[in-house]
Amino acid sequence: MSQIVVCAMYKFVTLEDFEAMRQPLLDTMIKNNVKGTLLLANEGINGTVAGTRESIDNLLAYLKADPRLVDIDYKESYHQEMPFYRSKVKLKKEIVTLGIDEIDPNKICGKYVEPKDWNDLISDPETVLIDTRNEYEIEIGTFKNAINPHTENFREFPQYVDENLDPKKHKKVAMFCTGGIRCEKSTALLKAKGFDEVYHLKGGILKYLEEVPKEKSMWQGECFVFDSRVAVNHDLEKGNYDQCFACRMPITEDDKKRPEYVKGISCHHCYDKVTEKQKARFAEREKQSQLAAEKGFSHVGDEAKKLAQLNKQKKQQAKEAARKKAQQ
């Protein structure tokens, strides 16, 4: 397979007709064989998709034809295989869920910082540097001296701010995330709470890794991504992590050697949290996945749907043939 372009994109912009946008956008993705998920809400668009160079260019051209999305923010990386199984466009209340209705980055947010200027900002001893991502993402990589809020999801971030940050004490706050969307919304939250100097990394970690040379980089480790690559290294190539299919946590080759790890069923992160009923279900899923692989099919996604439909048609044809034979 030729090299696949993985494109992460977002823009905070008022889309009053976001519901009507869904089907034409999905049709465009399917027509161009672009897979992945895009989220639409009144506050904007967000998602990561993948396809050939031509396919991604066609999708971006379609989006930019809308004057509201002409400057949509996007980052690209590359992979040898398609990292997604389906084409989806979902309607949401928020394109990234903070859970506070009055926070609107379209009205107020912090100051963008270009990747080339990021090192100077976070090297300033007056700067409080906060990683706005989840615990499991931070575990495999973050910026030097960044604070880990220890959140399980983005909805927990406002509580962290209320309990740990003070606009009178923390005069200069810089935040970052994978592609820029969570840290942008985080700056809107802090501005609403009275913080003055609030900054966020434009384009997120992915843009930083793309533009800042390794020898000057202050990034440590790998960057978690929400697709089958699991993580990317500083060259934006697939990293050294795999993923537990039970809990979706990143795992290393050493983690796979631990007694709690059973492929497709459990790992040391979730072994004590997964019920026997769930383990049985995961075991069956893994079995079906292996059978599909042996036949040269994917167990999930559009290919799996086609296989299921084909099997259904064969069964119906067999039943019809048996019925006709019985009537003879």
From Swiss-Prot:
It is an enzyme of class 1 (oxidoreductase). The active site is at C177 (cysteine persulfide intermediate). GO terms for molecular function: oxidoreductase activity, acting on paired donors, with incorporation or reduction of molecular oxygen. GO terms for biological process: tRNA modification. PROSITE patterns: RHODANESE_3 (PS50206). Residues 304-328 are annotated as: Disordered. This is tRNA uridine(34) hydroxylase. It comes from Francisella tularensis subsp. holarctica (strain LVS). The gene is trhO.
